[in-house]
Amino acid sequence: MSTGRQGIWLCPECGNHEPWKTRDRETNQIDRKCSNCDKRARVTLNRSNSGKGRKRNYQIWEREPTIDFGKIIEEAKKRNNKTLKNEVIRSKSEKATQEQLPPIWGLDWAPKNALFFTKKLPEKKVRKELLRFVAERHDGYLELISEVWISMQPSAQFNGETYHKFTKQFCQEVSKSLDERIWKPELSIIEGEEVIPMRDTELYLKRRNKRFMRDIRLCLRRVAYASSVDLDTHLQWQRWMTRTRAMDEHLKDLFSNGISTPDGGKFGGKGFRSTWQEGVVGCATSLNRAIDLSPENRHLADIIAPMIRDVGLALAVGQTPLEIFASQMGKSGSYMDGGNLDSGGRDLHIGNWEKGVLPPTAPLPIASATATGIALAAKLLKINRFHLAPVGEGCSSNGEFWEAMNLAGARGLPIAFMIQNNQIALDTFTVGQSGAETFGDKGHAMGIPSWTIDGSDPLQFHASTAASREYALDGGGPTLIHVETMRGCGHAHHHDDLYLGSVTGNPPGYVGRELLSYWAEKDPLPNHRDYCISIGANEKQLISMEKEEQAIVDAARKEMEEMPWPEGNTVTKGVTSRHDAESHTEQFERFEKDSREILSGPLNDGDLAIEFSNAPNSSTYSRAIQNAMVALAERHENDIVFMGEDMEVAGAFGMNIPLKAKGHSSKLLDMPLSESIIINSATGAALGGMRPVAEIQFGGF
């Protein structure tokens, strides 16, 4: 057993690895000659926790003295012989093969350009956020990340350029340290062993390293985006949050008191608010908004699929207070009109397709699943468009949401999912929704990068969405942003007393007082307002803005109240693109007809209009369908996709063989075994500009 120090050094001249050892532990220098090129190395040893010295131009790996020196020699030989497999992490073939491993989207993604920082960024602030994220998602790497960071001796402050350069070098060093793990003699016992069938240690760890480094680069990029925000952007967020809070107060009043209806009654409209969740407006400044584009280019705008707490986000991307009021109160001018002017009120949700806002849906995940289909169309049509799908933690329990994330993860779609944990879904506490440590763990299960942000801070929404968008449009695929927040109101307006408690104390309210106090102190409006002042905003300017926003919302409410109610007969218009629906009167008239009356047909009983042939070249239903599919493929070219189960090999019963024979293999898309996402994503793909043909393989499914 050695009593000195030992390890391996790398010759900078020829790249040969040489073993070394000293007589005792006190020796801190080695003087050796390379056996390959005779280059002499005189190096001062610098022990590091990663086992790697960084002095001069030499790389030194020190091993524990308890390890047999023969294993050190063997390690050097392996390094020189390059015995670590240079496996392909992801197949480069256009179509999947059975042996192919799951794709790692964003495999070696890194930001291309530096961002401009509005002020110097303290090194300690970056390190703190980096270690916080590693503690959240990869706690086993805390010491490694800290050791490599400190060893690189960063400057006390960064600007955009120096930060970009340093973090690029930092990621390279961390990646090298991760790759070194398998060389350590104490791990040689699992060398070549399968971690799981068909994935040996080297390959498995290499893939894990790639995923880890992807997460680290995204974390550092979020820090960069947060450092590039100026005062004007903060003031814009404050304006949007103020507008949202003013809307909330009006919506509460409308629900409580109602407005007069033509029949002499009262109607209070939809009953949802966004209290304490207004910070989501920060996402909008990271998006390519439709309202900022010319009409002919609005199909290139980013798409959002907000839920009921995301009124602020809808306002921030361009919906007006009048649009929100009209939709929530079901007035004729609502965009929920089925495409027929003055026929609003069919649904009481927000939404405006021309502005890139999908309406929320009562089956909660439908909007997210549809947005996933729109993202699929963007990828297939090579449209540079990003998609954002926020939901609550309750919705994340739904199978259709999982199906959407799974498809996005499998196909690398340009979408960010956002799970906003506001601590309760109606009256179901978070502990009843999931056993995962964080809701971000759900993304990890799909191979999707995920992280957590504080939902009271619009800056974190902005930075996360910006990083997700850049990553997605660079080909990295989907991300999952987990938001910890809390709703400061009941599920709906009528629910406040049960949730928060009545002013009389009866009912007392069931929400935890400690939880309520914690999040009340984080209310984004007053806190962000104070922050704006701390970085240079003018108090008078803020007061003026607040009065202006209140006046805008007040005027919108007045205009909504003067807007006519929809005529009842408009509800049947445009239910499909081909025909109107029957009115109740028309349905009753049809029911009242004698059901025993049999209309005369063109044929008598037993007669056939078509004789079916038994000839081998005769047409069949399946052949007619095959011919129709080929005709559609040739008519619509790259705008069509045939999507379903088992599409890319041949299709059930060989239905897709003619398509492949005619050169249309690229139009076939295998879908996960999830019938709901097949239909929902096909719907989204149609909205996104494609002609999807969705196939459910068997009727019994």
Show the residue positions of the predicted features.
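Short, cysteine/histidine-rich loop/knuckle motifs that typically chelate Zn2+
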Residues: 12-13, 36
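Cofactor-binding active-site loop characterized by glycine-rich and histidine/acidic residues
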Residues: 253, 262-411, 429-440, 445-447, ...
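Short, intrinsically disordered terminal segments enriched in charged and Pro/Gly residues
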Residues: 1-7, 24-26, 44-84
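Glycine-rich ThDP/TPP pyrophosphate-binding loop and its adjacent helix/strand module
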Residues: 106-111, 117-118, 123-130, 141, ...
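Small-aliphatic-rich amphipathic alpha-helix that forms the alpha element of a beta-alpha
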Residues: 403-407, 676-693
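Short linker/helix segments within small regulatory modules
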Residues: 22-32
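Cys/His-rich microdomains that often coordinate metals
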Residues: 18-19, 41-43
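Conserved acidic/glycine
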Residues: 77-282, 297, 489-663
